[in-house]
């Protein structure tokens, strides 16, 4: 193994094709309740592999790691063998790795882009690891096996389906504005996060957690907020409405033009009525938001939330489209919209599918336990406890 410091470790992770933000030193700062363990391997004086484990109560977990060239089977074998040794010396009771390797990539409606078997499962098996299978359920693994990603070599918004382009235009027409904000706007982001938690009956993250992401990753974290300045929107739309009325008066007997103006007037009146129903303070409402992180040549939407009260404004479509366009302008190659269920039939998958993404599938998790007792603890007892605790916290939140 190779001697290194944090800067060298991060440089390798950030430059490697298989690097991921969860293998960076900053991720351990976010997960401060876990103890980090980092290892690096070199050949001819140059680093060729690295891994960051986070350990807690005997569990050693490497999210999207180790980072290395998985086509180099000799290197993979050496790294896995060394990991078995260092985790045993470190007192690990249970080791879980989630290698950043795809088993397949396809478009949302096509299975033609497939990766062949790399023999990865066999290599892990030879070192005593068990593959946890190819479950499609989002909740079956710590990190989602399926992600929806959008290649950024496209022209936006032309690359989106027709309906998506219409919804984006609809958001602009309804005075939705998307801005990149700083940590000082986290309280606004939490409003849409809480609205999402209530709507879906889930618990996401606290404001302190999101603040820790900003503190650890700095400029690599961006907060997008979609807002409406309601007073300004009402004033501008009222002016637009009056202009349409005036134009209709002076149209004369041209039936086609008159009919078009009549439809525009009705649409404008409907928008004024809709804006008038909004409850707000300080003139501005937060429609939706998303927290984005940069890693290597890609970006990922880590968390997103929407207030259902403003669902008719299509803000989430404009927000996602803005994130993609910004990422392309900044020179990134790909944007991940985050994890989805593998069957692609849930509401989250259906929403993300409207941006014509590719679906990528990771191999999933490989586990190794010290003995059968610890295998039972980490595979059955601990997940059962966590599920009960999660339900109790959700119930307590509902009763407040």
Task: Report residues per predicted region.
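Extended hydrophobic/aromatic segments used for targeting, binding, or gating
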Residues: 288-292, 300-301, 327-333, 349
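Active-site/acyl-donor-binding loops of N-acyltransferases
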Residues: 109-155, 329-400
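Short, contiguous acidic/charged loop-to-helix segments that flank catalytic cores in large enzymes
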Residues: 305-314, 339-343
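Catalytic phosphate/metal-binding cores of nucleic-acid and nucleotide-processing enzymes, i.e., regions
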Residues: 61
């Amino acid at each position: 193994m190779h001697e290194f410091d944090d800067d060298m470790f991060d440089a390798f992770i950030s430059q490697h094709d298989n690097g991921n933000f969860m293998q960076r030193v900053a991720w351990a700062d976010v997960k401060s309740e876990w103890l980090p363990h980092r290892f690096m391997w070199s050949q001819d004086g140059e680093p060729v592999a690295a891994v960051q484990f986070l350990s807690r109560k005997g569990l050693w977990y490497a999210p999207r790691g180790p980072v290395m060239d998985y086509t180099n089977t000799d290197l993979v074998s050496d790294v896995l063998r060394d990991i078995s040794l260092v985790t045993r010396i470190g007192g690990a009771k249970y080791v879980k790795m989630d290698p950043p390797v795809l088993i397949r990539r396809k478009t949302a409606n096509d299975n033609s882009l497939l990766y062949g078997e790399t023999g990865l499962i066999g290599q892990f098996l030879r070192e005593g690891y068990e593959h946890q299978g190819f479950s499609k359920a989002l909740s079956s693994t710590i990190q989602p096996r399926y992600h929806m990603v959008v290649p950024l070599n496209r022209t936006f918004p032309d690359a989106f389906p027709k309906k998506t382009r219409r919804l984006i235009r609809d958001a602009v027409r309804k005075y939705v504005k998307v801005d990149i904000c700083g940590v000082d706007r986290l309280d606004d982001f939490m409003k849409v996060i809480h609205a999402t938690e209530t709507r879906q009956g889930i618990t996401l993250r606290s404001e302190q957690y999101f603040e820790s992401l900003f503190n650890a990753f700095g400029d690599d974290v961006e907060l997008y907020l979609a807002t409406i300045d309601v007073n300004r929107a009402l004033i501008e739309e009222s002016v637009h409405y009056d202009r349409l009325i005036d134009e209709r008066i002076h149209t004369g007997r041209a039936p086609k033009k008159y009919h078009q103006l009549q439809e525009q007037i009705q649409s404008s009146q409907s928008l004024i009525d809709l804006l008038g129903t909004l409850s707000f303070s300080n003139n501005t409402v937060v429609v939706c938001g998303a927290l984005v992180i940069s890693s290597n040549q890609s970006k990922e939407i880590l968390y997103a939330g929407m207030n259902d009260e403003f669902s008719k404004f299509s803000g989430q479509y404009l927000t996602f489209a803005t994130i993609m366009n910004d990422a392309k302008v900044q020179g990134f190659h790909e944007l991940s919209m985050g994890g989805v269920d593998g069957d692609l039939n849930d509401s989250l998958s259906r929403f993300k599918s409207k941006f014509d993404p590719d679906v990528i599938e990771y191999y999933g998790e490989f586990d190794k336990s010290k003995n059968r007792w610890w295998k039972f603890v980490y595979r059955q007892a601990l997940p059962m406890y966590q599920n009960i605790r999660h339900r109790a916290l959700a119930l307590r939140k509902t009763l407040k």
